[in-house]
A protein has these predicted regions:
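Short active-site oxyanion
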Residues: 1, 29-33, 66-69, 113-117
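Histidine- and aromatic-rich ligand-binding microenvironments
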Residues: 5-6, 35-36, 100-101, 122, ...
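Active-site-proximal, substrate-binding regions of enzyme catalytic domains
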Residues: 42-83, 87-88
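Residues that scaffold the ATP/ADP-binding catalytic core of kinase and kinase-like folds
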Residues: 13-14, 46, 81, 128
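Active-site neighborhoods of divalent-metal-dependent phosphate/nucleic-acid chemistry enzymes
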Residues: 70-117
Length: 134
């Protein structure tokens, strides 16, 4: 199975939570694992806001690169991500969730291009056929 790991899943993995243990097992058993480059930026921002030492941030980013193929934003991904974002935004309005971020669109768009399942606990992805819920 091909998977794409989103920010939510990485945060849980680095916390060492029960969900994080599940993420680790999913990554280890996957045929291929991906994460968009935007997820590295998103996690880096989160950790710097939380005043996590830079050395630890870099270690986590390196671990992500070691565990997954990092997918760049490409001319092929941009339209896929934009369409995915619009779908997520419409569903969020319907379900009365906060608006998704463009990062969410990049995650879903990249997963669709790779024909991969998104590993997440983010409510924006709940119920989608592309989701492995943690």
């Amino acid at each position: 199975m091909k998977i794409l790991v989103d920010s939510y899943a990485w945060v849980e993995l680095f916390l060492g939570s029960g969900k994080g243990g599940r993420v680790r097992g999913i990554i280890e058993s996957a045929d291929e694992a991906f994460t968009p480059d935007s997820v590295l930026a998103e996690l880096s921002r989160k950790y710097f806001r939380e005043r996590v030492p830079e050395r630890l941030v870099k270690e986590r980013l390196s671990a992500m690169q070691g565990a997954c193929h990092v997918l760049p934003i490409t001319p092929e991904l941009a339209p896929s991500a934009s369409k995915a974002y619009l779908e997520l935004a419409e569903e969020a309005r319907r379900r009365r969730l906060r608006s998704p971020s463009l990062f969410d669109g990049l995650v879903l768009g990249a997963a669709r291009l790779q024909e991969a399942k998104v590993v997440t606990g983010d409510p924006h992805f709940q119920g989608l056929p592309e989701t492995i819920w943690i």
